[in-house]
């Protein structure tokens, strides 16, 4: 099941602009909100964890951050969520983040997650080199290719993606780089 992570939950509650301004002007208030958002994430996930249903957390808003900001405003709250879920029997969670997050890749193993789903903007070979020994990688066939491509070009995109990631030490799963667009042909 997919849930929003603490940072995006906080951004949905307060607004992205307010969150970004608070990172400079009201860190204490933002940390309180993020702690609250982490508590929400923990409780929303409780029944899924207790029933051994896998959870993937998404943080589309966090792609706006620098590695330093990510370490301060995202990672501590993921660690809090993962630690609690692991107490309840979870083996960990997957994580998806939108956009070109190459600059953030090296921070992901600090989150306590099992794997990362990366957007098509990130080169799988680079992700594998940076975090493949610590995390499973999922991705990252272009949703635009899936929407607009021919069956042959989509197949080639899947093959190209697989060739880059199949030997990731912690595992690799072929998947779209983000959602499959709703207008995608069933063909």
Task: Describe the residue ranges of each PLM region.
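Active-site loop segments of alpha/beta catalytic cores
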Residues: 1-187
């Amino acid at each position: 099941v997919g849930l929003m992570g603490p940072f995006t939950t906080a951004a949905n509650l307060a607004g992205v602009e307010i969150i970004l301004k608070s990172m400079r002007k009201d860190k204490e208030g933002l940390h309180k909100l993020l702690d609250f958002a982490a508590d929400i994430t923990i409780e929303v996930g409780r029944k899924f964890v207790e029933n051994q249903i896998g959870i993937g957390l998404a943080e589309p808003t966090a792609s706006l951050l620098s590695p330093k900001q990510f370490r301060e405003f995202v990672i501590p709250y993921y660690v809090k969520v993962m630690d609690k879920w692991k107490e309840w029997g979870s083996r960990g969670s997957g994580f998806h983040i939108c956009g070109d997050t190459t600059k953030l890749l090296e921070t992901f193993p600090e989150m306590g997650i099992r794997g990362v789903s990366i957007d098509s903007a990130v080169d799988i070979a680079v992700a594998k080199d940076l975090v493949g020994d610590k995390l499973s990688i999922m991705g990252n066939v272009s949703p635009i290719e899936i929407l607009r491509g021919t069956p042959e070009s989509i197949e080639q995109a899947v093959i190209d993606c697989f060739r880059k990631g199949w030997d990731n030490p912690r595992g690799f799963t072929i998947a779209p780089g983000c959602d499959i667009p709703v207008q995608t042909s069933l063909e």
